[in-house]
Amino acid sequence: MITLKQALSLSQDELETLKNEIDAKVRASDLNAYIKAPSLNGASAKGVPILIKDNISVKGWEITCSSKILEGYVAPYHASVMENLHQNSMAGFGLSNMDEFAMGSTTESSCYGITKNPRDKNRVPGGSSGGSAAAVAGGLAVAALGSDTGGSIRQPASYCGCVGLKPTYGRVSRYGLIAYCSSFDQIGPITQNVEDASILFDAISGYDSKDSTSANLKPTQTFKNLNRDKRFKIAVLMDHIKDASNEVQLAYENTLKALKEMGHEIVEKKMLDSHYQISIYYIISMAEASSNLARFDGVRYGRRAQNIKDLKELYLKSRSEGFGDEVKRRIMLGNFVLSSGYYDAYYLKAQQMRLIIKEQYNKIFEEVDLIFTPVAPTSAHLFNYHASPLEMYLSDIYTIGANLSGLPALSLPVAKDPLGLPIGMQFIAKAFDEQSLLDVSYALEQELDLKLD
């Protein structure tokens, strides 16, 4: 597939030809990365076609978050990132499959069915932005937008062999993003390479008065300033890879060796055990999800239950029929931790621990430029692999720290396991220092020259 950098130099006629080619490929593909052929929606404007995750509002398109409960809901306005794309010669072209309401790590919970990993169709593409990553890796999209709440851009990028960037919280407007966890959610790019990630990130970044959490900063110019010659002080976290598979640990060590040979300084630092971060993340995210999803009741928009006798039954049937099992589980757990008698023991304590984690990251970044970790404990696994939801939650162990602290992080493919499956590694930077993430990744990408096709 042509890269984003290359596509931006095409004429409008050439772009129309490209869109027709993408549409034909999507119709012929069995990955189920798109919800439907992109031509059925049409493009949101003239420009380079960008795949959009199904939780980002595109005016006039049916946006469902891959959930039955939003069946028939047509977005009445553009998300701010869509307006930004249009101003930068890009346009939405197709909606990507995802875990329902972005709650999952495998893209198995979508009402549209599972998405397959293009590297091995018997395996998951990761999630929740699995459709975006599978499409980019499978040659079905030039580039894509995803959302990242606890690793939902970076983990599927790692599983599929793409570059995935989660920007600093507030760097990219969330206006028009259908919320899962408002204090963690962030929109970001999934692309074929670091240059494309930089270009797409620059296009969607910047202050937005419609988002109260938006940082008052101008759009970034990371692509213009990409520098592969910078050298950084990079921290690795002690005992941090003990939960990773042997293949991931080997890729981690080999990448560290490459970074040292490139002239970067590697130092060891210690943080709170990552298993605590899992507990903190899920308590807070489920609590916020239970609040955010309370609006989906069958009254104002989306699916409405039939043959009901009163308002209470309308609420109960619409929500029980419309939500999938994982979403129901998180809503129930979220309501539990917010309930009387449990708020202080769970939610309040989790928020206090979140502050401690942010302070630990800030302390580390007083002495280093970047932190280096795996993205996921394993490469992509087979479908129906997790015996319990808890096992799936643990797959986020390396990614959630950046969301808890609001820091930017990037997933870069660095190796292949013995089965030929991609393995990604992650860089985390201090707040609003996406430039360093992209610089070090750009240099490492060229140094490794990993061929995944």
UniProtKB/Swiss-Prot annotation:
Biological process (GO) annotations held by this record are:
translation
What are its GO cellular component terms? glutamyl-tRNA(Gln) amidotransferase complex
Active-site residue numbers: 53, 128, 152
Under the heading InterPro entries, the entry gives: Amidase, Amidase_CS, Amidase_dom, AS_sf, GatA
Report whether Membrane shows up as a keyword of the record. no
Q: Does the keyword S-adenosyl-L-methionine apply?
A: no
Which Pfam families does the record associate with it?
Amidase
> Which GO MF terms are attached to this record?
ATP binding; glutaminyl-tRNA synthase (glutamine-hydrolyzing) activity
| UniProt catalytic activity | L-glutamyl-tRNA(Gln) + L-glutamine + ATP + H2O = L-glutaminyl-tRNA(Gln) + L-glutamate + ADP + phosphate + H(+)
Q: What is its EC number?
A: 6.3.5.7
Q: Which UniProt keywords apply?
A: ATP-binding, Ligase, Nucleotide-binding, Protein biosynthesis
Query: Which Gene3D superfamilies does this UniProt record tie to the protein?
Result: Amidase signature (AS) domain
Q: What does this protein do?
A: Allows the formation of correctly charged Gln-tRNA(Gln) through the transamidation of misacylated Glu-tRNA(Gln) in organisms which lack glutaminyl-tRNA synthetase. The reaction takes place in the presence of glutamine and ATP through an activated gamma-phospho-Glu-tRNA(Gln).
Q: How does it assemble?
A: Heterotrimer of A, B and C subunits.
Concerning its family, UniProt says: Belongs to the amidase family. GatA subfamily.
- Spell out the protein name for this chain: Glutamyl-tRNA(Gln) amidotransferase subunit A
Q: Which organism is it from?
A: Helicobacter pylori (strain ATCC 700392 / 26695) (Campylobacter pylori)
